[in-house]
Structure formats: C-alpha cells, structure tokens
C-alpha cells in the first residue's frame, strides 16, 4: 500500500507540473562570439552600429516556434561555457530565457551575431504572450502562433528601462 501511495504521489506530481510548467531546456545553435569589447562600452568598434542592432525573429515551424535572436550582447564567459536557453509555458504565457551557461562573469561583452532554438508544444492559432530575456529583460510581446507566421521585432523598442 505504501508503494502504491508513493507511486500515485509521483504520478500526481508529474501530471500537475506537466512539461509546460517546468523550465524546458532546448538545444541552441549560435554564431558564437564574433566580436568583443570591454563591459560598459556601448558599441563594438570594429563593427558598424547598424550591423549590431538587436532583433528578435519568431517563426512558425512544424516542430514548434523558432526563436532567433540577432546581435545579442552576452558576457564573454560564453567563449568557454556556451549559451543555454530554456522556456516555460504557463497558460498562454511563454517565458523564454537565453543566458551564459556558466554564471562566472568577466569584464567583457561578446556580440553573438545569431542564436536560434525551437520551442515545442505551442497550440496552433492561439494567442501567446512572450516574456523574453537575453542579457536584458524585454517588455512582453504578443503574437498569434499559426502557419505562415514570421515576425521581426526591433528589441531596442522593447527594452525595459
């Protein structure tokens, strides 16, 4: 009886949390660090500022929501430890976070030209609110997930101040 009760509690926990309530780690591909600068400097001297504007692209794919970030400024620790990302879906709120895998910070910022991952499990033709974090926190972005969806966001407009 004790084993059955324990098994039922574990099953209840798994069902109640669901795969959407807990952070879901995803594979991420990226360009890696293409340029770096000292922390506190606003630009990358070797690059045209037009080429370093932060952008976010959301696209429908059969596998899930493709999230592509262009021109992310992350800590140079990614050169050794890489970038991780995770998503949590709670109701219609999708929280997406990309971050340096190793929490050790250096006095250096690295420009990542692009990084992309796919978030599975969204329902087609449904409105979602994306809470996106990558280096900065951004204001919520609303979108409808459906076939043919391809959205571009200038992230400077969405930065929280």
Language-model segments: what does each one mean?
Residues 4-14:
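Sec-dependent N-terminal signal peptides
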Residues 17-161:
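Exposed, flexible binding/inhibitory loops of compact, secreted disulfide-stabilized domains
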């Amino acid at each position: 009886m004790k084993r059955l009760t324990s098994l039922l509690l574990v099953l209840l926990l798994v069902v109640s949390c669901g795969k959407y309530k807990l952070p879901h780690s995803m594979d991420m591909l990226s360009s890696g660090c293409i340029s770096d600068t000292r922390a506190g400097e606003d630009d990358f001297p070797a690059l045209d500022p037009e080429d370093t504007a932060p952008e976010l692209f959301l696209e429908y794919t059969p596998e899930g929501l493709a999230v592509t970030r262009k021109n992310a400024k992350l800590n140079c620790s990614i050169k050794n430890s890489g970038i991780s990302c995770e998503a949590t879906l709670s109701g219609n709120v999708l929280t997406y976070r990309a971050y340096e895998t190793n929490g050790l910070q250096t006095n250096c910022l690295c420009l990542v030209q692009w990084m992309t991952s796919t978030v599975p499990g969204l329902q087609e033709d449904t409105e979602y609110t994306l809470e996106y974090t990558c280096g900065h926190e951004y204001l919520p972005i609303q979108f409808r997930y459906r076939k043919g969806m391809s959205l571009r966001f200038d992230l400077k407009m969405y930065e929280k101040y």
